[in-house]
Amino acid sequence: LFNEDNELIKKKIENLNNKIMILLCVGESKEENKKGITKDILKDQLEVIKNLDLDESFTVAYEPVWAIGSGLTPEPKDINEIHKYIKDVVQSNSVNNLLPSVLYGGSVTDKNAGSFFNEEFVDGALVGGASLDGSTFAKIVNIFNKTKEL
């Protein structure tokens, strides 16, 4: 979006770590998804955290670019698999073996949130357009709370 390379993103994370909650958004394009190289793309994007001592508030949002605002979402089992992969990559690459929270963002609505909130490795959602309507956003929050039994 801003044409930031991994080196610049890594410097930003290093400078902001322990000062604010960092939310790193990663995701693949429709073409990359169709080619079956999603994990390769995510691994490359997650290189920015290699050898960093991450704060426990560090969070990753998986946002498949092809799903944002499209009304399309991956299957819940696929979202879960990708979230597990992201957690594994971050944990193995950070100095302190941090197991991050991973949020899903990509056409999140009150109609589909429950399907992926039920998945083991989905820790929450990064809600875009649906957050503009307070009642819809409240429904998503309630679905999350019921699903995750907070």
Language-model regions, residue ranges each:
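Active-site loop-to-helix "anion-binding N-cap" substructures in soluble metabolic enzymes
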Residues: 1-150
